[in-house]
A protein has these predicted regions:
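Short, conserved beta-turn/loop elements at beta-strand boundaries and strand-helix junctions
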Residues: 17, 109-119
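Flexible glycine-rich active-site/ligand-binding loops centered on an Asp-His dyad
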Residues: 120-157
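Enriched for short, Lys/Arg-rich terminal
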Residues: 130, 222-237
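Active-site-adjacent substructure of cysteine-protease-like catalytic cores
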Residues: 49-101, 200-204
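Conserved positions in beta-strands of structured domains
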Residues: 13, 105-108
């Protein structure tokens, strides 16, 4: 087997601080913004010439918290309740022969360094990537070849995509508004509305928690309603 190495060209900076709660696919949370911090020498302005003419880009990145030794041919997709196996190449599981992720995101802005003219980073939305994730490459999204309206989705075509109603008390709502921007709150609600729990967890009285923007967001789910019940600073790790 021939080994190869990949160059890290940048890092993702965003509000997703742990794996639980991250959107399961890119594009599901249009309000969630992320910043791709570029590293030299890949931050040269010339490398980005013409990119601002594209509305969307592809990001190739590293499942940096999913590395493990050995190859497993099948995995249990959470959306199938965690009790059915599919071939790893028929899923987007992070546990792959090469831990490479692929996401299509909307390009919102290119930020330049005023002192040296280099690119500080890219502002994108719709990312499904953890904060601190290494990025390997950036490519433009080409509608004429990357979009396939006739495509079928295999086993995912039969999935019931949840859409929960997200609510909170007046006190919790006020606390959210003092901590986060309106865009961050809208992105949080988009994430929660998709039901971040694994498919095999359905305990109405259980309190769940996810790290978002440096805070522990705790919630319960009953029927089709998700209630944010606490917003707290995370405890010591």
């Amino acid at each position: 087997m021939t080994n190869t190495s990949l160059e890290v060209i940048g890092y993702v900076r965003c509000d997703y601080k742990e794996k639980f709660g991250i959107p399961r696919q890119s594009g599901l949370t249009g309000c969630a913004a992320a910043f791709i911090e570029m590293l030299p020498p890949y931050n040269q302005a010339e490398a980005f010439r013409g990119l601002d003419e594209f509305s969307h880009i592809w990001l190739l990145w590293d499942f940096s918290r999913a590395h493990k030794n050995g190859f497993t041919a099948t995995v249990k997709p959470p959306k199938l309740g965690g009790n059915q196996r599919m071939g790893v190449f028929a899923t987007r599981s992070p546990f792959r022969p090469n831990n490479i992720g692929l996401s299509s995101v909307r390009l919102l802005d290119i930020i330049y360094n005023e002192e040296n003219g280099c690119v500080h980073g890219l502002v994108v939305s719709g990312a499904d990537i953890l904060d601190g994730t290494p990025v390997y490459d950036i490519k433009p999204y080409l509608p004429y070849t990357d979009s396939h309206p006739e495509a079928t989705g295999g086993w995912t075509d039969s999935l019931d995509i949840p859409e929960l109603s997200v609510c909170s008390s007046d006190d919790i709502t006020a606390k959210l508004e003092t901590i986060f921007s309106s865009t961050q709150i809208e992105a949080l609600k988009e994430i929660l509305a998709q039901d971040p729990r694994p498919g095999y967890q359905d305990e109405p009285n259980r309190r769940y928690g996810m790290l978002y923007g440096g805070y522990d967001i705790r919630f319960t789910i009953s029927d089709d309603t998700l209630t944010i019940c606490e917003v707290a600073e995370p405890g010591p790790q």
